[in-house]
Amino acid sequence: MPQLSRYSDEHVEQLLSELLSVLEKHKAPTDLSLMVLGNMVTNLINTSVAPAQRQAIANSFARALQSSISEDNAH
């Protein structure tokens, strides 16, 4: 996802690498990985964001996700 963030690219990449390592360690297929990551996002929003802002944060996250998806045929 494109990021306009107060976090360094290095910090983001380190967390991403560690999360991917956990999924690989458990040999999680794509559908399970997406389910777990989606549940993680839901949990973060529900436990860390004020109720009045949850829908806006979820919509913003969904738009950022959609805009970051590549349309090429490689996978």
Swiss-Prot record:
Write down the Gene3D superfamilies for this protein, in alphabetical order.
YejL-like
InterPro entries from the entry? UPF0352, YejL_sf
Top-rank taxon of the source lineage equals: Bacteria
> Could you tell me which cysteines form disulfide bridges?
none
In terms of Pfam families, this protein maps to: DUF1414
- Signal peptide span per the entry? none
What HAMAP family does the record tag this protein with?
UPF0352
Q: According to its UniProt record, which protein family does this protein belong to? A: Belongs to the UPF0352 family.
For this entry, the protein name equals UPF0352 protein YejL
Which organism is the protein's source? Salmonella typhimurium (strain LT2 / SGSC1412 / ATCC 700720)
